[in-house]
Curated annotation (Swiss-Prot):
Annotated signal peptide: none
Keyword DNA-binding attributed: yes
Gene Ontology terms: cellular component: primosome complex
Name listed for the protein in its UniProt record: Replication restart protein PriB
Keywords in alphabetical order: DNA replication, DNA-binding, Primosome
Encoding gene, per UniProt annotation: priB
Length: 104
């Protein structure tokens, strides 16, 4: 089964770093995406806020460069996580992160 997502946007919630009891580092943040997409011959505004989690040692170094306002592209897979309140939310599990040069 295919499960791949690439999403570019701006980090809109500060990264939260934790280490699991088994020693695996995790970094969580929220990515806001805004764009214009073409659908059925018409332009439409596309917008979402996607929770992102980065797990493992491989990508942790780049997460230290990520702050609110950072523009990035994230590639990975999506999965549902159940919150403490019982509601499910879609989460992007990052496998590759690229900082987008702002040109400043």
């Amino acid at each position: 089964m295919t499960n791949r997502l690439a999403l570019s946007g701006t980090v809109c919630r500060a990264p939260l770093r934790k280490v699991s009891p088994s020693g695996i580092p995790h970094c969580q943040f929220v990515l806001e995406h805004r764009s214009v997409q073409e659908e059925a011959g018409f332009h439409r505004q596309a917008w979402c806020q996607m929770p992102v989690i980065v797990s493992g040692h491989e990508n942790q170094a780049i997460t230290h460069s990520i702050t609110v306002g950072s523009r990035i592209t994230v590639q990975g897979f999506i999965s549902c996580h159940k919150a403490k309140n019982g509601l499910s939310k879609m989460v992007l599990h990052a496998e590759q992160i690229e900082l987008i040069d702002s040109g400043d």
